[in-house]
Amino acid sequence: VQVVVLALVAQVTLSQHWSYGWLPGGKRSVGELEATIKMMDTGGVVVLPEETSAHVSERLRPYDVILKKWMPHK
């Protein structure tokens, strides 16, 4: 049992972490980087390029469904 737990822990710690918006190797797409820079310049207001905002909204749809299901007050 201890060997199985150790193997599972090793697998999780050695696997690559995929953060939302990041590509393998710790690289971000150019559109998201531009949005981050623009957000810093505007005092926290995010201004996305048009093609990026359409792409991001498509990717976020499943997450919106999950959030509405688990957090109905937001």
From Swiss-Prot:
Pfam families membership: GnRH
InterPro entries: GnRH, Gonadoliberin
GO MF entry, a single one: gonadotropin-releasing hormone receptor binding
Signal sequence, start to end: 1-15
In-chain residues carrying the UniProt-annotated modification Pyrrolidone carboxylic acid: 16
Membrane-spanning residues: none
Highest taxon of source: Eukaryota
Chief location of this protein within or outside the cell: secreted
One GO CC term, this protein: extracellular space
Subcellular location: Secreted
Keywords: Amidation, Cleavage on pair of basic residues, Hormone, Pyrrolidone carboxylic acid, Secreted, Signal
Modified sites of kind Glycine amide: 25
Protein family according to the UniProt entry: Belongs to the GnRH family.
Function: Stimulates the secretion of gonadotropins.
PANTHER family xref list: GONADOLIBERIN, PROGONADOLIBERIN-2
Stated name of the protein: Progonadoliberin-3
Organism encoding this protein: Oncorhynchus mykiss
Upper lineage: Eukaryota, Metazoa, Chordata, Craniata, Vertebrata
